[in-house]
């Protein structure tokens, strides 16, 4: 099974064409996750802290969500839809309780009303409630901190080295591994986001209670390939 170590979304259009707008760096930094954020539930796409991902927004309710977010703090939450979501997709289908908040770094509003956005992961969150005052979903959330103690950073660095070696062993010919200059945190999350696996397995990685636990799970997964 091939590894997806570069983001490849069928809906992606590069945000380098005329009309793309960047969000100023000062606005793109969130010192704390808001108590309430809009949710963007998706069937086959996850986001991890420190990673970037492009999206095309075409449903009217989510166009409104992006327009509102751009007027506010630029933050939305990516959550994975649970199996069976098709029965109530137009309403409020079942979702997982842990997601990742992201800030809109770049966006482009197309003539037909669609948005192209580049989203940068900020932090994982836990949903503690929902509000139904908007056409899109709003959730009350709590941030799930991924802070590391000094001794845990040593462990994470060792696990990152294991992951790098295992990736080199299974990468298809011509594929590029992640940038070796990345911080350990970012490296682990980029591999977790882009390694080819079922989305339910990726959700399991997202829900790990620490970066060390996530890295250990990645090592175990790569060793089974």
Over which residues does each language-model region extend?
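N-terminal low-complexity, acidic/polar interaction/targeting segments
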Residues: 21-225
């Amino acid at each position: 099974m091939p590894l997806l170590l570069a983001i490849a979304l069928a809906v992606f259009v590069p945000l380098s064409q005329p009309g793309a707008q960047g969000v100023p760096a000062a606005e793109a930094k969130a010192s704390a996750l808001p108590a309430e954020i809009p949710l963007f539930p998706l069937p086959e796409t996850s986001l991890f802290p420190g990673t970037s991902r492009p999206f095309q927004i075409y449903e009217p309710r989510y166009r409104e969500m992006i327009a509102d977010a751009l007027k506010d703090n630029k933050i939305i939450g990516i959550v994975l839809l649970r199996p069976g979501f098709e029965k109530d997709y137009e309403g409020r289908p079942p979702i997982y309780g842990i997601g990742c908040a992201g800030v809109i770094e770049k966006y482009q509003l197309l003539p037909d009303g669609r948005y192209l956005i580049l989203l940068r992961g900020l932090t994982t969150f836990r949903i503690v409630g929902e509000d139904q005052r908007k056409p899109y979903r709003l959730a009350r959330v709590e941030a799930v901190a991924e802070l590391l103690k000094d001794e845990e950073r040593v462990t994470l660095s060792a696990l990152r080295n294991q992951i790098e070696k295992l990736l080199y062993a299974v990468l298809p010919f011509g594929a590029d591994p992640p940038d070796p200059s990345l911080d350990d945190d970012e490296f682990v999350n980029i591999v977790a986001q882009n390694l080819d696996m079922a989305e339910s397995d990726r959700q399991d990685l997202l829900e790990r209670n620490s970066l060390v636990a996530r890295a250990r799970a990645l090592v175990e997964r790569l060793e089974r390939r």
